[in-house]
Amino acid sequence: MERITVTLGERSYPITIAAGLFDDPASFMPLKAGDQAMLVTNQTLAPLYLDCVRGVLENHGVHVDQVILPDGEQYKSLTVLDQVFTALLAKPHGRDTTIVALGGGVIGDLAGFAAASYQRGVRFLQVPTTLLSQVDSSVGGKTAVNHPLGKNMIGAFYQPVSVVIDLDCLKSLPARELSSGLAEVIKYGIILDRDFFLWLEENIEAVRELQHDALAYCIRRCCEIKAAVVAADERENSMRALLNLGHTYGHAIEAEMGYGNWLHGEAVAAGMVMAAHTARRLGQFSDSDVERVKSLLVRAGLPVNGPTQMTPESYLPHMMRDKKVLAGELRLVLPTAIGQSEVRGGVAHDMVLASIADCLA
């Protein structure tokens, strides 16, 4: 068992990583006998894990209710969020309840925002079941729903009380979803940890094959990096913005193509290559490093080109709604070397368009 702490003073919390955690009620602390909890999951995961997690909690004396939502990025919306609020109010659940987010990034983001909003804030546990949510979205307190004009535009910073990562969940994850998660894994190596990038170049196939030691190390290292960044910059005023490598381009793909048609990690992968080409055009990232990034993404089963249905010009309106835009100026996360990156403003739109064109299949 691995345990990492996200250090945020009184709001610090543990990330627990191991196989078989769903069988142990201690995994779901601080829930205890007599507590009330609302389990939030989706229609795909409910048959796989709901009875197990609910049973463990109820046998521990926790009073559990549940809400089962439709599955997919297109349902990360205010309309579906209202279903969670309705379930909480119907029972009813008070300010002493705990929301348990059992699912991937969509469930975690949506349930977390519900926790941040319901009666002005109730505690919640993240129980991520996808690689992407285990290495990224469950850690750090970003919660949100989408708007038709932009991804994650309505949300809050709201930290969980615990993150429970059961490695066994990945055995049921479709290969495409696993690859999607690997985009965020590779991102950490590009932006902050050259040694981890080198390790991934040697071990990416072992991770895709779910070999235990490689998988456990991979998830642990990602969580260590994310925890350190969040502890240093919880509200994304500086360093935390680096975690958005590829996302400014990628969110444009998701919004333009329709949420769910491109998985988040697929869009981020193409976006990271676009960012690499932008950095190359600025003279701060070598041709050989661009090729290394592309090669690793391909080996991870990810796209390195944007959708053929989009023109470079179709990206810009979405990119200008990015949360890093300040005073109307586009700001991009760009690599400066493998393991190093920066947030850079003032990049000419013509250069951005040319970099996107570099990645059109």
Curated annotation (Swiss-Prot):
It holds the Pfam family DHQS_C. It catalyses: 7-phospho-2-dehydro-3-deoxy-D-arabino-heptonate = 3-dehydroquinate + phosphate. It is found in: Cytoplasm. Keywords: Amino-acid biosynthesis, Aromatic amino acid biosynthesis, Cobalt, Cytoplasm, Lyase, Metal-binding, NAD, Nucleotide-binding, Zinc. Signal peptide: none annotated. Zn(2+) binds at E184, H247, H264. Gene3D superfamilies: 3.40.50.1970, Dehydroquinate synthase-like - alpha domain. The keyword ATP-binding does not apply. Pathway: Metabolic intermediate biosynthesis; chorismate biosynthesis; chorismate from D-erythrose 4-phosphate and phosphoenolpyruvate: step 2/7. One of its GO terms (cellular component) is cytoplasm. Binds 1 divalent metal cation per subunit. Can use either Co(2+) or Zn(2+). Its main location: cytoplasm. One of its GO terms (biological process) is aromatic amino acid family biosynthetic process. Its EC number is 4.2.3.4. CDD domains: DHQS. The keyword NADP does not apply. NAD(+) binds at residues 71-76, 105-109, 129-130, 142, 151. One of its GO terms (molecular function) is metal ion binding. Belongs to the sugar phosphate cyclases superfamily. Dehydroquinate synthase family. HAMAP family: DHQ_synthase. This is 3-dehydroquinate synthase. It comes from Pectobacterium atrosepticum (strain SCRI 1043 / ATCC BAA-672).
